[in-house]
């Protein structure tokens, strides 16, 4: 998967690329100096950000060593890449102004642990930009969580669950984060 991620035959990974302009637009609303990309894969978003803002520092975190190896091959001078768990960030407290997580949250078995790590590692007034698959249609979410996610796991995709607005809101509240905006765009996005 790591080698395929940024190819023209990436399949599901193509969905991630559609998020980049909106993530960039959201990041540009407030200044940041240190950014974490949680579930960074081979770091396509960090590559784009580093070109646009070379004076800032970026950290990529991914559980998969092959993804981090691909990211490191890019030799991004203002970036650090770490193999680690997005449910238990291996970083000191208050070390990031912004954390982005694009299309990896549905892989996390313990969503609350992720939000707790975000809260611990964000500086005061820092922000999380989370993009993932979801829907307001409870039947569709049930079908995906009952059928599609388990089938995807049979093929090694590591999917766990489609998060809902309720799950995100509850996790934010329990971790002490303030949910400022929750949008569902174009069907499952």
In which residue ranges do the predicted regions lie?
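A conserved beta-strand element that flanks and buttresses the S-adenosyl-L-methionine
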Residues: 100
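Short alpha-helix
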Residues: 160-175
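Conserved class I S-adenosyl-L-methionine
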Residues: 1-30, 44-48, 67-70, 129-152
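A short glycine-rich, Lys/Arg-flanked "PGG" loop and its adjoining helix->strand segment in the class I
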Residues: 112-124
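Conserved catalytic loop of SAM-dependent methyltransferase domains
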Residues: 180-189
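Class I SAM-dependent methyltransferase SAM/SAH-binding core
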Residues: 36-38, 42-88
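Short catalytic micro-motifs in class I SAM-dependent methyltransferases
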Residues: 103-104
